[in-house]
């Protein structure tokens, strides 16, 4: 029983550290953040920080792995859902983890995490569209459309996050879903 309590406390501390790092990365670059900055922001002692992580870069790496893993799980369910349901799930995840996405879209963040999430989306979109349109579909058209589509979706989501989620989630879902219809119509027109 005591082990579960300790694990829960450890998880709470790690989440506080992750959140502190994310908030700080909206203000300054990773290389300018200190353990003391995180400790102050998370309201923990430095010793507590070092019980969980080696250094700032270890925190960033672990947070990156968690985000990529969770986003990857969402993407694997893409083909099973309508575009509206898929976008709703993605935007739910983003709104539940806004602090991390503010970090991801911050000019102070290294572009590595952003690029890795982008690659995940591009890869899954490629698999999804290949299944939809078959292996004989012109790869050059798919590649161009996938990059356009994923980067466009990211731009809309980044704007939504950086403006404090001021537009209703339903509006973003509807907009992205409607744009998808145009993209799919274009892809079908190129099959002939």
Regions found by a protein language model. Name each.
Residues 1-28, 32, 37:
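Basic, helix-initiating cap at the start of DNA-binding domains
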Residues 17, 32, 44, 55-60:
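Short amphipathic alpha-helical segment with a characteristic S/N-K-E followed by hydrophobic residues
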Residues 110-135, 140-155, 185:
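Amphipathic alpha-helical packing segments from all-alpha helical-bundle domains
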